[in-house]
Design a protein with these regions (language model features):
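Core alpha/beta nucleotide-donor-binding catalytic domains of modification enzymes
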Residues: 1-203, 232
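Conserved anion/nucleotide-ligand pocket segment
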Residues: 199-200, 204-216
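Internal, active-site/partner-interface "lid" segment
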Residues: 188-195, 213, 217-221
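Short coil/loop linkers at secondary-structure junctions
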Residues: 49, 80, 180, 211, ...
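AMP-forming adenylation/ATP pyrophosphatase catalytic core
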Residues: 5-30, 51, 86, 90, ...
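Residue-level detector of well-ordered alpha-helical segments, enriched
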Residues: 127, 215, 260-264
Length: 438
């Protein structure tokens, strides 16, 4: 226990930043139960804010009981605990494991503010299973890198303190501490690939090769190093191809080999936090989107979004709900949070680049995303035009035209964020600042 706590302390000390908190993903299983005990001790020793979150998927009839136990154990450990309910949209052919995992991390992300740490309980056996599953899928070095001890997550960092510790060691320590934990009955169902490996494959591998966990950890680490090196070698090329609006220049891509091009597209999608495409999808991005006829409007649907082409550039378009019906009043010098992760908007009077004159009644200013039927007269133009035409003239891709904030004064367009100010509202009172998500 002491050596594990020492390792735990070293990890948290390395990653913890002052004025932040530590969040524990707490399922109540033996892994997170031991992490709760370690975190409770660390909190007493270092006096830092800690919080636990139980994600309730509703997949088991025991979930309510597990949630109750998790809150009880957390209270006994002196750590606050929330129960976060999620619902899964089960579609034919989709993995329940994958859907549950995605929903769990989306729920946990809501608790992570800038610099916070998220602790999860993956251990050495999980790493071995992940490696074998990646082999089964035919993954390359990226997939075989498996899980890192730490990785960026939401606005903070995800840390896996148990990643080099075997399951049987975790159980032995938990028993020595007389801890109770929950047993998820689904972990015995060998219809799931991971459970099949856990119960039928990994024990045989370990019996034959007792150092298999360390060997896999070493291979995963070497694969991760190769991935990092590839990114470093292509970094300059990547940033030549990457445009200010996060699109990717097709001409720059075309000047490189097929292998380098595929890697650059993967780097681009990774920067957008998109799920990695398959080899077939990667080929289609180039052949059917990038190289489509010039008069075509090509796109390729992937999970979470689609790749599109506009003016010889590739764009990643995230799936977003329709926002053109959204309209909210905006106050001067107060940040307005936009829907669907579209960022923040502010009318700032403290800027040195003021371009807008405030109207007689600023309280009537509002923000919309619907350009339908609106006209405007940009300061730099000789006459007014429909916003639809202006978007074309300003080379705004069609799919973005209902995701750009429009500042309104009653029924008049005051400004379109990042594009122009209407001539009737030109002045030096304030500036419209759109802080887009990274």
């Amino acid at each position: 226990m002491e050596s594990l706590y020492q390792h735990f302390t070293q990890l948290l000390t390395a990653y913890y930043q002052p004025q932040t908190k530590v969040v524990l993903a707490f399922s109540g299983g033996v892994d997170s139960r031991l992490l709760l005990a370690l975190l409770s001790r660390y909190q007493r020793d270092h006096e830092i804010p800690c919080h636990a979150v139980y994600v309730h998927h509703g997949l088991s009839s025991n979930a309510d009981d597990w949630a109750y136990k998790c809150q009880l154990w957390a209270k006994q450990a002196g750590i606050s605990c929330d129960v976060e309910h999620v619902s899964l949209e089960l579609n034919s052919g989709e993995s329940i494991e994958l859907l549950a995992r995605e929903a769990r991390y989306q729920a946990l992300a809501k608790y992570i503010e800038s610099g916070d740490l998220l602790l999860t309980g993956q251990h050495a056996d999980d790493q071995l299973e992940t490696f074998l599953l990646a082999l089964k899928r035919g993954s390359g070095p990226k997939g075989l890198s498996c899980m890192a001890e730490s990785t960026p997550f939401s606005a903070g960092t995800l840390v896996r303190p148990l990643l080099t510790t075997r399951r049987e060691q975790i159980e032995a320590i938990a028993q020595s501490l007389q801890l109770e934990w929950v047993e998820d009955e689904s972990n015995q169902d060998t219809r799931y690939d991971r459970n099949f490996l856990r119960h039928h494959v990994v024990p045989e591998l370990f019996q034959r090769w007792p150092s298999i966990h360390q060997a896999v950890q070493r291979s995963a680490s070497l694969c991760a190093q190769q991935e990092t090196l590839l990114d470093e070698l292509l970094n300059d090329v990547f940033y030549r191809a990457l445009q200010a609006d996060l699109s990717l220049d097709i001409a720059e891509l075309a000047s490189h080999s097929e292998l380098a091009r595929a890697r650059l597209i993967r780097m681009w999608l990774a920067k957008q936090n998109a799920q990695m495409p398959t080899q077939v999808q990667l080929s289609l991005i180039w052949k059917e989107v990038a190289l489509a006829q010039q008069d075509a409007n090509p796109k390729l649907k992937l999970k979470q979004g689609e790749v599109r082409r506009f003016q010889n550039k590739l764009y990643w378009v995230c799936d977003k709900a329709e926002v053109s019906g959204w309209q909210v009043h905006i106050q001067v010098d107060c940040a307005l949070v936009l829907p669907e992760g579209l960022g923040e908007l502010m009318l700032s009077t403290t800027t040195k680049q003021a371009t807008i004159a405030l109207p007689p009644q600023p309280e009537l200013l509002s923000v919309t995303f619907n350009p339908e039927g609106l006209t405007a007269h940009p300061v730099t133009r000789n006459h007014s035009r429909k916003l639809k035409k202006l978007f074309q003239e300003y080379h705004v891709p069609s799919w973005l035209r209902r995701q750009i904030p429009i500042l309104m004064y009653q029924d008049q367009v005051v400004a379109v964020a990042d594009l122009f100010v209407d001539k009737a509202f030109s002045g030096q009172d304030c500036e419209l600042i759109w802080r887009k998500p990274l």
